[in-house]
Amino acid sequence: MSEAAAQPPFEIRTVAVIGAGAAGRGFALACAGAGFHVVLEDVMPSNLRRAEADYADLTAHTAAGLLELALTVEDAVRAADVAVDFVPDELESKLEIFSMIDRMAPPKTILCTPSYTLSITDLASCVYRPERCVAVRGNLLHGGSAVPPTVRLLYPVAAAESTLAAVGWFLRALGIEVRRELDPDVPSLIKNTVL
């Protein structure tokens, strides 16, 4: 069985998506379309209504019953295997969301952020489960492109292999190729020791 098809030791079935703006909404719908149970959270009811309308179009084809809407992070992450935040890429916003997810989600939950500018090492250092933190850099929405996108899966030194395997499997299930990389913001001395 190939690595892409092999199930990781930790299986992702329920995805919490925090933030129902355009990117979060699109990612949530892609996850539901791939057969994952998704709980989409946003504090703005209008964003959730838009997601519900988009989802109604999708359910006619494939994903009936796979999307739930939530107005609180606590409700969204209650049973999540992975929580992916789509809040603004600002340190204070990301730290607040990571802290909330860390407090409210079950210990098994992986924290994932599609950050282009922030260090996953810095974010992971502020939670009780740094071994379950990753960042994704690249396009998580490929819109049926013939060429699947490749994203960088960035991880802190503390990341567990099971976390990387599970997130890699999850992203490949969405049609996204994955290239693992130790967080480039890790100091060189530590990188050399780890590698």
Residue spans of the language-model regions?
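NAD(P)+-binding Rossmann beta1-loop-alpha1 motif at the extreme N-terminus of oxidoreductases
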Residues: 2-61
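Structured loop/turn residues at beta-strand edges in well-structured enzyme cores
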Residues: 10, 77-78, 128-131
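Structural motif
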Residues: 18, 41, 70, 86, ...
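Short glycine/serine/threonine-rich phosphate/pyrophosphate-binding segments
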Residues: 24-26, 92-95, 118-120
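Short amphipathic alpha-helical segments
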Residues: 28-30, 52-53, 95-98, 123-125
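Rossmann-like NAD(P)-binding element
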Residues: 43-46, 50, 60-110
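Rossmann-fold dinucleotide-binding core
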Residues: 110-181
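Helical "substrate-binding/catalytic lid" subdomain
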Residues: 173-174, 182-195
